[in-house]
Amino acid sequence: MFTIEVLAQKLAPHASFLGGLVVAAILGLFIFFQEKDRKVLDPVEWRSFKLVDKDHLSHNTALYRFALPRASDSLGLPIGQHISVAAEINGKQVVRSYTPTTLDDDKGHFDLVVKTYEKGNISRYLSLLTIGQEIKVKGPKGKFVYTPNMAPHLVMIAGGTGITPMYQIIKSSIKTPGDKTRLSLIYANIQEDDILLKKEIDELQAKSNGRFDVKYVLNNPPEGWTGGVGFVTKEMIEEAMPSSGVGSANHGEGHKVLMCGPPPMITAMKGHLAQIGYPAPRSVSKLEDQVFLF
C-alpha cells in the first residue's frame, strides 16, 4: 500500500529530471486524494468527536450529531456494524455500543439516535451533553456487514431504538443502484410518539419502487390507527416472509431474518420463529446465520 513516504522515495531518484516543482505537485495531488475520502474511525484508538447538534425526536429520545475533523471525512463504518462510545462516569470508564444512522456518504459528521433510560449511564451522559462537548468513540465492531444483494429478501424485526441498524441497512440498500434486495420491516413500539425515524422510513419506502415494505405495531395505538396492534405475532412475521418461505419445500431458502430490540421482545420473537421453522440465533450471531441478532 502506497503512503506519502513510499511515494516520495520512489520519486526521489528522478527529482533532478522532473524538477522540484513537478515532484511537489505530484506529492500535493497524492496528499489531496488520500485525504479527500479519509476515514477517521479506529478499531483500537479512542477518538474524540464534538457534539454539534441535538434534535429531540420524542420525550425520551434524541438524535445527536457529532462533527468529524474535516468536512470531507467519513466515519469509515461498514453498513450493519456499530461503534463503541465511552464516557468517564463516577471515576470509571463506561462503554456502550450504538449504530449510527448515517452512512459514509454523509460526510463531515455522524448521527446517533439514543433513548435516555433512567438507569442508563451512557444514555443519560449523552442527554446532558452540551454543544461543543465531546465523546470518545472507536470501532467498527460487529459480525454483520451488509453488501448489496447478499440475500434475495431481508426480514427485519425491530423494537424501539433497535431500529437503528435496520434503518442504516435499509437506507444503504435503497440508495445503492443495482441492489435488488427485498426488504420487509416489522417495527414495534408502545405508542405512536415512540416511533423513531418514521418520516425517514416512510420516505425510503416511497423511493423503493415497491421493494421495501414496513408494518408498524403499537401496544397502545391511537384512535383510527391502521397498523398492527399489540405485540408482534407469529402471523405478522409470516406475512412478511417471502411467498416461497413458510410451508414450502424450500422454506426460508436464500433470505435472512434480522432482529434488534428489548430482551423480552427478542425472546418472544425467537419463540415465533421456532414455530415457523427457523433455527434459534446463536448467542453471538455470525454473518452466515439465517437468523441474525444484533
Swiss-Prot record:
Catalysed reactions listed for this entry: 2 Fe(III)-[cytochrome b5] + NADH = 2 Fe(II)-[cytochrome b5] + NAD(+) + H(+); 2 Fe(3+)-[Dph3] + NADH = 2 Fe(2+)-[Dph3] + NAD(+) + H(+)
Needed cofactors: FAD
Residue numbers binding FAD: 127-142, 153-185
Topological type in the membrane: Single-pass membrane protein
GO MF assignments: 2-(3-amino-3-carboxypropyl)histidine synthase activity; cytochrome-b5 reductase activity, acting on NAD(P)H; NADH dehydrogenase activity
UniProt-listed GO biological process terms: protein histidyl modification to diphthamide; tRNA wobble base 5-methoxycarbonylmethyl-2-thiouridinylation
CDD domains referenced in this protein's UniProt entry, alphabetically: cyt_b5_reduct_like
Pathway(s): Protein modification; peptidyl-diphthamide biosynthesis
Principal location: mitochondrion
Ranges of residues in domain FAD-binding FR-type: 44-147
One GO CC term, this protein: mitochondrial outer membrane
Location(s) in or outside the cell: Mitochondrion outer membrane
Pfam families xref list: FAD_binding_6, NAD_binding_1
Membrane-spanning parts: 13-33
Keywords (A to Z) from UniProt: FAD, Flavoprotein, Membrane, Mitochondrion, Mitochondrion outer membrane, NAD, Oxidoreductase, Transferase, Transmembrane, Transmembrane helix
UniProt key word Transferase: yes
EC identifiers of the protein: 1.6.2.2
Keyword Transmembrane helix among UniProt keywords: yes
Domain of life from the UniProt record: Eukaryota
Annotated family: Belongs to the flavoprotein pyridine nucleotide cytochrome reductase family.
Assembly mode: Monomer. Component of the 2-(3-amino-3-carboxypropyl)histidine synthase complex composed of DPH1, DPH2, DPH3 and a NADH-dependent reductase, predominantly CBR1.
Protein purpose: NADH-dependent reductase for DPH3 and cytochrome b5. Required for the first step of diphthamide biosynthesis, a post-translational modification of histidine which occurs in elongation factor 2. DPH1 and DPH2 transfer a 3-amino-3-carboxypropyl (ACP) group from S-adenosyl-L-methionine (SAM) to a histidine residue, the reaction is assisted by a reduction system comprising DPH3 and a NADH-dependent reductase, predominantly CBR1. By reducing DPH3, also involved in the formation of the tRNA wobble base modification mcm5s 2U (5-methoxycarbonylmethyl-2-thiouridine), mediated by the elongator complex.
Protein name as it appears in the record: NADH-cytochrome b5 reductase 1
Gene expressing this chain: CBR1
